[in-house]
Amino acid sequence: MGWADSAIETLRTGSKAVIRPHGGSMRPRVLSGAEVTLEPANASSVEVGDIVLCRVSGNVYLHLVKATEGAGPDRRVLIGNNRGGVNGWTKAVYGRAIEIRNP
């Protein structure tokens, strides 16, 4: 089971979820161990600059939407971290951060 599987399942039911991601790729916006509250979202409902829980090439990230392309069910988003890295394009967006409580 992956670090965010439980949150992804909760978001899929239409409920909010809380995660505590670890790592430094989103500093200073999200610090390692922060409590992040997510609301359900998908690629069509997020905008550039949103912090989202998503899957890119089989990996789950809590990263930024860097760009969008397309519309409706064909819309996809470019995901990257807060330090200049880019993960790639995806349609697999599960949630958007609505509250971040850094330690």
Please give the residue ranges for each predicted region.
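Extended hydrophobic leader/signal-anchor segments used for secretion and membrane insertion
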Residues: 1-103
